[in-house]
Amino acid sequence: MDPVFKSAIFHLEPMPGRPSRHVVRHPGGVAILPVHGDDFLLIRNHRRAIGHTLLEVPAGTLEPGEDPKHAAVRELAEETGAVAASWSSFGHLWPAPGFCDERLHLFIAEGLTLGAPQLEEHEEIERVLVPQAEAIQSAAAGAYADAKTAVMILRFASRKG
């Protein structure tokens, strides 16, 4: 279908069979749960779209044709300054399937070496070490407003047993 709007990151198309609705076509993204000893390395990130600062896992958008693991390595370094010795795929999720086809590839990063973040000009990000037990308890209590973060922490907890 011909897009009704195009941006540098996504484009908008009419929804098949529902001309009054639209679909956001997105290149996909990555989200990383960085494990640093008994802590998770999360970020405090100001989200202009909602006007709030959230505690969340590092994440980012895929470049056209980019391998998801390559994007995850890049985003972890940019947002936290960390380099991971070990990477594991952690599945995927669809963050907003009612209107957007973004597929979010999930990764666990372990064996971290911390360096300086390489933030983009518009990013307002602070890295935060959170004890795993505290993060798991917070996620179970619904304290994370960011869905990908809650899902990843709870999946990690269920994997640990």
Question: Over which residues does each language-model region extend?
Answer:
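Acidic, metal-coordinating catalytic segment for phosphate/diphosphate chemistry
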Residues: 1-31, 36
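A generic structural signal for well-ordered coil/turn residues at beta-strand boundaries
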Residues: 6-11, 28, 100-103, 121-124
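Active-site-adjacent beta-strand/loop module that shapes the phosphate/pyrophosphate-binding cleft
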Residues: 10-19, 93, 97-115
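Short, well-ordered beta-strand micro-motif
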Residues: 14-16, 34, 108-110, 131, ...
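Conserved Nudix-box catalytic region and its N-terminal flanking loop in Nudix hydrolases
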Residues: 24-26, 30-74, 78
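Structural motif
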Residues: 40, 52, 101-106, 125
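The catalytic Nudix box helix
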Residues: 57-89, 107, 121-122, 131
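Nudix hydrolase/Nudix homology domain
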Residues: 97, 114, 122-161
